[in-house]
Amino acid sequence: MLFRSAVAEMVGGNRLLRIDSHGILTHVAGDGVVGDAGDGGPALAARFNGPHNLAVLPDGDVLLGDTWNGRVRRYHAGPGTVSTLPGFNAPPPAARTNGPYCITLTPDGRELVIADLRRVQVLTLSTGRLRVVAGNGKKGTPADGAAAVDAPLADPRAAAYDRRGNLYILERNGHALRVVGPDGRIRTVVNAAGAKGATGDGGPALAATLNGPKHLGIDRDDSVLIADAENHLVRRYSPSTGLITRVAGTGKKGAAGVGGPPEQCELNRPHGVTVHRDGTLYITDSYNHRVLRIVP
């Protein structure tokens, strides 16, 4: 997934890469071998295990969700070293379920939102305090209006806060987008039925269907971009209207159409969507092994 000037090569690559403003790609962390080593030493000698997501700190350091090691690692850009972020640990084999599949910073940059496949937690970076904000650890469909911390979730794959204090949670096997309001109550906003499908673009989001969505991003207007992976689409949920629309992809798996309208560009199981502060949308077109950019 690409954010600002960093790219993480996910799962199979076990590396962290960086693209600078001139388009030059540099390998900055990870030796490409599966493992759990390297804290305190050179980042290029460090080993990761299936990293799925990253977040860039205000100081330029990069947090990496080292998913199957069950930890969050920190790449220190200045000295070029790696360390483990204190406060979160899911020891193997629990890391396959409870590892950090998605990490996002809160809008103020002070806390880290961590989604595993059972719950969503928030880590205060200054203190290392970790608290659960959604999910009771059981798999199921949450009831609208339930307290989020007491509700089950169906494989929450990604989570992020908007600027109004709403927490959006994307469920991979629930095929749905939920929101937890500032009052701590959860409700469904996309796919009320929870059915697997690819319907509803241009209409009410509650009547739409998704298929194995993998990631989300919050746009500058607080709309939610969804990497609808198994539909080979990127879609947008607009809270102000309650509608869902197609942003990119034809719905057909493929690689054609780069350089043309985003809706005519084929995708192949996109696993990441990130909005730069200038409004540029980056799409991790995972099974085409490429990163795409949509300029506003």
Report residues per predicted region.
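Short loop/turn segments immediately following the C-termini of beta-strands
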Residues: 10-11, 67-68, 117, 125, ...
